[in-house]
Amino acid sequence: MTVKLTIDCMGGDHGPSVTVPAAVKFVRSHPDAHLMLVGIESAIRAQLKKCKALDEPALSVVPAAEVVAMDDPVEVALRKKKDSSMRVALNHVKEGEAQACISAGNTGALMAVSRYVLKTLPGIERPAIAFALPNPTGYTMMLDLGANVDCEPQHLLQFAEMGHALVAALEGKERPTIGLLNIGEEVIKGNETIKRAGELLRASTLNFRGNVEGNDIYKGTVDVIVCDGFVGNVALKTSEGLAQMLADIIKEEFSRSLLSKLMALLALPVLLRFKKRVDHRQYNGAALLGLRSLVIKSHGSADAYAFEWAIKRGYDAVKNGVLERLSRAMAENAAPLGESGRDADGAGQASPSAGQPAEPSAALSSKT
């Protein structure tokens, strides 16, 4: 089976100078993949020429006249840029011409446009960015990592249901353990939203283990960690910054003297393994969980190596039938809060409208 993916080539801080080389390298190592490169045709072809890939049969160029900038408000992406690379890439997924979309674009815009074009799964009010973070024995699924800055307690419960369904689908665990990210383990800790979310989780049928703290994220304390997108994004980027700092410190210390350089040479295999394990770029690419089709969000600052990993996330998700397994697990195991469209509070980064965005509205004004 050929895995067909659309690439929003104009998204991110670097656009085609990163996305196109990453796509070229990916298809050369994955013969069963076909990537549709969406964006300004001249810019894409210029990069293909640099990569000596103008005639690469596994790549096709899909023109799009507009670009969603990283600082564009959501209303601009939805109402004014209907021929953007982001929108066109998602449209091809909607029409069944591709099985997933990968974008490094503006998070708020990507979430809102994805909801509008692709719609959410039944019972899902807000999609969330979910990613598997490494721990000593495997991984911990964490969500939301940036899609919804402000959440109500019922949204956190629904994130837990989606995380439960995803881990159940991928790992075969009947009752994955759930933790709520907080400033302490005690039930009295946290703001009112967190306290109320804890009450809802304890009253649910989920295997809720209570509050977890930031130092539990990489311990493997629970299978799924739930938080709002503001907290999750800060936690993720703090971790990436720490990993980079540790790698820089080790490099600096082993470069101080001739003796330390000789020691580094002896320790090179260990250092290379360490570098690989802490290189956050290989963890780039997170799923927008809760949509009816697959969308993978890359870091906006990703380089070509990191963006290639995001493409791989989409490729693997298609090959492993993640969407189908998630949908089935949600239907079998989760207890949805109600039909999509109940959310009327307007909170969140992706879109202030409830449920599925019916039509782009002038009221949409959030930025990422």
UniProtKB/Swiss-Prot annotation:
Region annotated Disordered, chain positions: 334-368
Stated role: Catalyzes the reversible formation of acyl-phosphate (acyl-PO(4)) from acyl-[acyl-carrier-protein] (acyl-ACP). This enzyme utilizes acyl-ACP as fatty acyl donor, but not acyl-CoA.
Name of the protein in its database record: Phosphate acyltransferase
Family: Belongs to the PlsX family.
Recorded name of the encoding gene: plsX
One GO term (biological process): phospholipid biosynthetic process
Record keywords: Cytoplasm, Lipid biosynthesis, Lipid metabolism, Phospholipid biosynthesis, Phospholipid metabolism, Transferase
Record InterPro entries: FA_synthesis, Phospholipid_synth_PlsX-like
Classification via PANTHER family: FATTY ACID/PHOSPHOLIPID SYNTHESIS PROTEIN PLSX, PHOSPHATE ACYLTRANSFERASE
UniProt source species: Burkholderia thailandensis (strain ATCC 700388 / DSM 13276 / CCUG 48851 / CIP 106301 / E264)
